């Protein structure tokens, strides 16, 4: 609260005129972040609609990495949090999920988004080298490739990912994982496991 007060050029105690405590401030910040998630109009294709919704959640969490820690750590009662939860629940219910299956699907897809953002965080925030210079990154890449040379599968994998733009690679990984996750949920629906 002291740092926030200093940033606002006021005392830490002035912040308490607006919020009761740090937890309330975090709740408000989380709800404001969730306001950034666009709720797409339903198209009738629950998978496509859920992909769009979760893509928005991923974009928001990538822009505000601190939200991944807060998402399930406290109840979210703000209007934007409730709006988001309602949209996701409606999509899953329209697909046929109910009861424990609805709860599992709801939390699993959000946990997947949180995990993908957390896993990508260090790759986004840290350059390949401490200096961040292109020449140092290239030297590090060459060293990693040399270290992989005795291992054919690893060498081929490193060559493949080296050819991709980092953000594009992270997006492809997210899309692949989400597709597999939705395939599994679809299979459960087909098998009638949603009681």
Q: What feature does the model see in each segment?
A:
Residues 32-36:
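Short, basic, alpha-helical segments at the C-terminal edge of helix-turn-helix-like DNA-binding modules
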Residues 26-28:
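Short, Lys/Arg-enriched C-terminal cap helix and immediately downstream tail that follows
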Residues 30, 58-79, 87, 118, ...:
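Amphipathic alpha-helical segments used for helix-helix packing
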Residues 122-195:
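C-terminal peripheral helix-coil segments that are non-catalytic and often amphipathic
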Residues 1-24:
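Helix-turn-helix
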Residues 38-83, 99-109:
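Hydrophobic alpha-helical connector segments
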């Amino acid at each position: 609260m002291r740092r926030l007060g200093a940033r606002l050029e006021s005392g830490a105690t002035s912040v308490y005129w607006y919020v009761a405590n740090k937890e309330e401030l975090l709740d408000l910040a989380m709800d404001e972040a969730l306001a950034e998630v666009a709720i797409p109009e339903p198209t009738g294709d629950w998978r496509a609609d859920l992909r769009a919704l979760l893509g928005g959640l991923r974009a928001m969490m990538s822009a505000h990495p601190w939200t991944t820690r807060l998402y399930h750590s406290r109840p979210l009662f703000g209007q934007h949090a409730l709006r988001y939860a309602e949209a996701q629940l409606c999509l899953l219910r329209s697909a046929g999920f109910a009861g424990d299956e609805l709860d599992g699907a709801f939390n699993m897809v959000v946990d997947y988004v949180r995990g993908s953002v957390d896993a990508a965080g260090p790759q986004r925030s840290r350059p390949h080298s401490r200096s961040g210079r292109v020449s140092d990154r290239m030297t590090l890449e060459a060293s990693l490739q040399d270290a992989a040379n005795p291992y054919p599968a690893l060498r081929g994998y490193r060559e493949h990912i080296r050819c991709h733009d980092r953000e594009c690679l992270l997006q492809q990984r997210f899309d692949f994982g989400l597709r597999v996750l939705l395939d599994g949920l679809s299979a459960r629906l087909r098998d009638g496991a949603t009681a």
